[in-house]
């Protein structure tokens, strides 16, 4: 057999998804069309890969770091002309298909130890988004991270990540995934989320995006403090009070209580007054 004798490796954070119902929900969320080119991150033994190849997608390209799994995947899908495989670290290898074309959608069971860097690679940052956004990403993440991504203002898990991701994309829950859905089962619960990146014309303009990033870094360094204190280094008290009054926000609030739209308006207010330069 292609994967005979291969066991999940802790250093690669390997947990095989074996729940057929979850695999079906992932595929449904991807909404695969005949002209889609799919990028799969961390295919493992190919359970999801098999489902993707059974869809109408024109191509499926997978990136796998584990050399032994690469060998097994090549054997398992040797007769699939629409399948291509890249061995290497998804954080550094090219993510284009074998023929150089970009993928249209990403479907992945992401290794939990690289979630943050991989999200940035796939989506970019507010001030440096990817040039060609994917139509959608269906990602299996640790539940805690998924909750932060889709959190609402005022919730305990609302963070700078919540603001950034919600200004880059629309994020919705697909389904919860308990530990028993994996082999071996992880110690944490997981969740499948759907991320639909905003079109380039819907993104923040570069200067405004840079200023939002600067404000988020400043404010969320001390998320328990009131805005009056966290933004004290950004503006003198008098100007800060005037801007808050103009925007209708209270400086008694804490960073996690402001919506993404309010952070944008706060940054826009600074832009209009030209009161502070964003960090480089």
From Swiss-Prot:
Keywords per UniProt: Cytoplasm, Methyltransferase, RNA-binding, rRNA processing, S-adenosyl-L-methionine, Transferase
Catalytic activity: adenosine(1518)/adenosine(1519) in 16S rRNA + 4 S-adenosyl-L-methionine = N(6)-dimethyladenosine(1518)/N(6)-dimethyladenosine(1519) in 16S rRNA + 4 S-adenosyl-L-homocysteine + 4 H(+)
E.C. no: 2.1.1.182
Gene3D superfamilies reported for this sequence: Ribosomal RNA adenine dimethylase-like, domain 2 (1.10.8.100), Vaccinia Virus protein VP39 (3.40.50.150)
Signal peptide per UniProt: none
CDD domains on file: AdoMet_MTases (cd02440)
A cellular component annotation (GO) from this entry: cytosol
First-level EC class: transferase
SMART domains: rADc
Similarity comment: family membership: Belongs to the class I-like SAM-binding methyltransferase superfamily. rRNA adenine N(6)-methyltransferase family. RsmA subfamily.
The protein's name in its UniProt record: Ribosomal RNA small subunit methyltransferase A
Chain's gene name: rsmA
């Amino acid at each position: 057999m292609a994967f005979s004798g291969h066991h999940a490796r802790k250093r690669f954070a390997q947990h095989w998804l074996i729940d057929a119902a979850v695999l079906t929900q992932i595929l449904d969320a991807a909404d695969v069309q005949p002209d889609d080119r799919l990028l799969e991150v961390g295919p493992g033994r190919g359970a999801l890969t098999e489902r993707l190849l059974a869809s109408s997608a024109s191509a499926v390209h997978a990136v796998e770091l584990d050399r032994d799994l690469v060998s097994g995947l090549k054997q398992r899908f040797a007769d699939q002309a629409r399948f291509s495989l890249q061995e290497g670290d998804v954080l550094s290898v090219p993510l284009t298909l074998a023929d150089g074309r970009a993928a249209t959608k990403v479907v992945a069971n992401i290794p939990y130890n690289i979630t943050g860097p991989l999200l940035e690679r796939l989506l970019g940052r507010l001030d440096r988004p990817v040039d060609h956004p994917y139509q959608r990403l269906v990602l299996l993440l640790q539940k805690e991270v998924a909750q932060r991504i889709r959190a609402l203002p005022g919730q305990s898990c609302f963070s700078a990540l919540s603001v950034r991701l919600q200004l880059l994309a629309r994020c919705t829950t697909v389904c919860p995934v308990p530990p028993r859905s994996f082999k071996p089962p992880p110690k944490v619960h997981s969740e499948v989320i759907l991320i639909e990146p905003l079109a380039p014309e819907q993104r923040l303009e570069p200067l405004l995006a840079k200023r939002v990033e600067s404000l988020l870094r400043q404010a969320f360094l001390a998320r328990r403090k009131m805005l009056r204190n966290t933004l004290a280094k950004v503006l003198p008290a008098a100007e800060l009070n005037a801007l808050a009054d103009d925007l209708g926000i209270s400086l008694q609030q804490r960073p996690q209580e402001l919506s993404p739209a309010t952070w944008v308006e706060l940054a826009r207010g600074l832009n209009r007054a030209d009161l502070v330069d964003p960090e480089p």
